[in-house]
Amino acid sequence: MTAGRTSAVEKEAAKKKEWRPISYWPFIVPAMVVVLAVIIFPWAYTIWMSLHEWKVGSPPTFVGLANYLRLPTDARFVESVWHTLVYTALSVALPLILGTLAAVIFNTKFPLRGFFRGLFILPMMATPVAIALVWTMMFHPQLGILNYLLSMVGLPPSLWVFHPATAIPSLVLVETWQWTPLVMLIVLGGLTAIPSEPYESAQIDGATPWQTFRYISLPMIMPFLFIAAMIRMIDAVKSFDIIFAITQGGPGSASETINLYLYSVAFVYYDVGYASAIVVVFFALIIALAGALLHLRQRTHWNDAGGSA
């Protein structure tokens, strides 16, 4: 009798198991349609356009890989790639260093700490256009406050964004000012998660503040630094609004990144096919940079528990 009931139960369970996957489709199909419509189709269409010579007002003509072969010989594109790499490297490194230093400071107790922490994160809340307008006035060679501050400490004035040699460093200064607070918040979250026991042991052993940071804090916050670096890298490499609002890629093309050159090709010269090829290569560059950062994480053995081997 028991065996008969068991057999019936098993048959019923087998039927339910057999039909269960079918019930999932009404929930999966809408998501698949959205993915196809929003992600896959635009990329497929972009790749298709990159294989054609297509200028606004004329029909597309298939040219194969001609647009891609044109890229290495395009001096302006090569220059924009170099500008993008320099801008990205500086815009990642400086906020990481300064944000970590700020996090260490705000992790200690001092009067009005909450007030100063609130002031510190204000730059990341401002809109890019407002930031660009304020910094453009500050960068003015004659009327800007930055040259006034330089004169107060006996340093010569600078042309800032109005000179090719200092345009990108000046833009990095704006990027650092805006996004150092974000790095500070991420790293501060890691510091506050560290238990107090290792610090107490280090204090008993007579460790200096630098030794405490180097051998306790820094290994523990490595995963948080990686997250901050990844966020900053992706954001910096595709930066457009602040650069366009302050310099528009100038003087000349001294601060023109890939994004700005892409904008010129697509919306000034209306070369849609060539612009599509730039988009594909630009996306590949972002993937390569993200992959390099992930590889660095694996090589240094960063893990969820913190630490670097």
What kind of region is each of these model predictions?
Residues 19-309:
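A structural signal for multi-pass alpha-helical bundles of membrane permease subunits
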Residues 1-19:
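Short, Lys/Arg-rich, polar N-terminal cytosolic tail immediately upstream
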